[in-house]
Amino acid sequence: AKSSVERLILGGDFLSDARRKLLEETWNAKVYNSFGMSEVFGPIGNECTQQAGFHYPDKDLYIEVVSPETGEPVPKGEVGVGVYTTLWEKGFPLLRYWSGDLIRIIQEPCLCGSDLPRFEYFGRMTDCVKLANGTWISPKQVEEYTLSAGILHCQVQLHKDGSACLVYDEAGVKPAEQLFQQLKELLSCDEVTGQ
């Protein structure tokens, strides 16, 4: 039977394109993501019909993106830690609140036509790994590849020798070599194996 659900609005965790696709196919409904923080009393960013980043009210919220190491602003369009300042007059103001979230401000205008700025969310710093080349990798990025290969639950182990191992427990799933190549490029590894 067809579900009467037309749309799902999610929040509380990152949403990869692969997970969005899986949910949309399962529910036969559009999936939208919302971004919030209890420190700011709820949602601060929402996806529009384009599903291409979180629009946020820049008259109420000022967002800086800074280097996790130095606290200095990163170049426009680059990933860093979101630092939030609320601009409303009443209540509990936040001044340069260091969130621990890795984000980037999207520079291009949204196809929906809104003038509100947007940001992309990559995950919590504590969930991400900084590679030897300085690149931050989030679970969202790994999940794009693993979910597409039919792997719902996995762990990626990075080794000091420049290799990585994808540990998964999916009966009957044998990842294609393409998955290992994609992870090798993403993780800047010499070799990726599975078990």
Predicted regions located by residue number:
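Active-site glycine/GP-rich loop and adjacent strand/helix microenvironment
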Residues: 1-195
